[in-house]
Amino acid sequence: MKTLFFATTNENKINEVKNILDMPNLNLVVPKNFNIKETGTTFKENSLLKAKALFAILNKNQNVFGEDSGLCIEALNLEPGIYSKRYDTYKLCKKLSTNEKNQLILDLMKNEKNRKAYFICNISYISKDRQILNFEGIIKGEIALSLNDDKNYGFGYDSIFLTKNNKKLSDLTLEEKNKISHRGIAFSKFKKFLLKSLFNN
């Protein structure tokens, strides 16, 4: 059994990552009350900030990784971007529910013809011997015209993101989503690396 520490407290991300990695011999450990300010200007910088913070907390003696992801919309100058999680406070200086944040995006995109957008996921890994590696995944699509009120799956902006198959991410099961999503792509790359390195020793 190998142990790997994940610098997050986001339950939705944890569930997706466990499903994608699907490694019975991997003990994925999530720290309690882990909180760090995302001061980076890119997804890569933020994922590395998280990984470095957890690496330090664990006395630089464990394999760790951080992840940062978000939605980038062409017509909004690639916003919400790195502010995806906190776009409500960034844009309106107040907290909104998930549906309200989605509606905020739709309102900003009202009458906008260019609806191209993409989700990006960036992973930063730090090994016990201080090796730093980065993995990234992107899924391109469009912003829908309306909210998916009867969504069955997903979280965050999934209910307003249309894939190339004209399906919203929130219409897909977790398994279906993880085959094509930004997180699925990035963590599939990460899994290949882990199988070759961590589980080959």
Curated annotation (Swiss-Prot):
Keyword terms, alphabetized: Hydrolase, Magnesium, Metal-binding, Nucleotide metabolism, Nucleotide-binding
Lineage: superkingdom: Bacteria
GO biological process: nucleotide metabolic process; purine nucleoside triphosphate catabolic process
Residues given in the record as substrate binding sites: 8-13, 69, 155-158, 177, 182-183
One Pfam family matching this protein: Ham1p_like
Alphabetized InterPro entries for the sequence: dITP/XTP_pyrophosphatase, ITPase-like_fam, RdgB/HAM1
EC numbers on record: 3.6.1.66
Residues reported to bind Mg(2+): 68
Transmembrane regions: none
Enzyme class per UniProt: hydrolase
GO molecular function per UniProt: dITP diphosphatase activity; ITP diphosphatase activity; metal ion binding; nucleotide binding; ribonucleoside triphosphate phosphatase activity; XTP diphosphatase activity
Cofactor note: Binds 1 Mg(2+) ion per subunit.
Record field: catalytic activity: XTP + H2O = XMP + diphosphate + H(+); dITP + H2O = dIMP + diphosphate + H(+); ITP + H2O = IMP + diphosphate + H(+)
Active-site residues, as the UniProt record annotates them: 68 (proton acceptor)
Required co-factors: Mg(2+)
A GO CC annotation given for this chain: cytosol
Function field: Pyrophosphatase that catalyzes the hydrolysis of nucleoside triphosphates to their monophosphate derivatives, with a high preference for the non-canonical purine nucleotides XTP (xanthosine triphosphate), dITP (deoxyinosine triphosphate) and ITP. Seems to function as a house-cleaning enzyme that removes non-canonical purine nucleotides from the nucleotide pool, thus preventing their incorporation into DNA/RNA and avoiding chromosomal lesions.
Family that this chain belongs to: Belongs to the HAM1 NTPase family.
Assembly and oligomerization: Homodimer.
Name recorded for this polypeptide: dITP/XTP pyrophosphatase
